[in-house]
Design a protein with these regions (language model features):
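Active-site-proximal or metal-binding-adjacent scaffold patches in catalytic folds
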Residues: 1-92, 101-180
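Walker B catalytic acidic pair
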Residues: 97
Length: 180
């Protein structure tokens, strides 16, 4: 968890208001349970995280079989989600984390049903966001000379790997995209 900047705190607060209002509209929980989400602190993940888009952190010693909103220490979102181009996906990620904060610990069928109640398109952008993060932080691109597929990576391939699509040996190319 990283402490958000002033701008990030403002963006997180606006995001929280939007998501809580939408959760009231779709009737996820009763109003008092939703209001219990309001005091949960929002923070940001480290900028170099590539796999995790958000996380709900529970306090140590919380009873895992009976999680309550009071047991939530913080909800962290990836700082790049606060960029306006990812706003729709950021709302979905915060909604997802709030479902955890309401006591839905596992990604089981019941959790997925609640997740599907989200009325906006952002939910489909998860894979795209992961690829964006990997591309941003990659030092090397493993490039297929045959089909031009690119695999962003931290290390060189040195001819040890083949393309998933056509089995051609991958070539190392320095990633020229700027990391923010």
């Amino acid at each position: 968890m990283a402490k958000p900047s002033k701008e990030q705190s403002i963006a997180l607060s606006q995001l929280k208001d939007e998501v809580l209002e939408q959760m009231k509209t779709i009737g996820i929980e009763d109003e008092s349970r939703l209001n219990s989400l309001n005091p949960i602190p929002l923070a940001v993940l480290r900028r170099n995280a590539t796999q995790r888009h958000g996380v709900t952190r529970f306090r140590r010693g919380a009873n895992a079989s009976e999680l309550k909103t009071e047991d939530v220490q913080t909800v962290d979102l990836h700082p790049m989600l606060l960029d306006p181009s990812w706003h729709d996906y950021a709302r979905f990620v915060l909604y997802h984390e709030y479902l955890h904060a309401l006591g839905n610990r596992f990604h089981d069928a019941a959790f997925r049903r609640l997740e599907q109640l989200w009325p906006h398109d952002g939910a489909e952008r998860g894979r795209e966001f992961t690829q964006f993060l990997r591309q941003r932080t990659a030092t090397w691109l493993w490039v297929c000379a045959t089909c031009d597929k690119k695999y962003p990576r931290k290390r060189r391939a040195n001819g040890r790997f083949r393309c998933r699509a056509c089995s051609t040996t991958l070539v190392d190319v320095m990633n020229t995209q700027e990391a923010n």
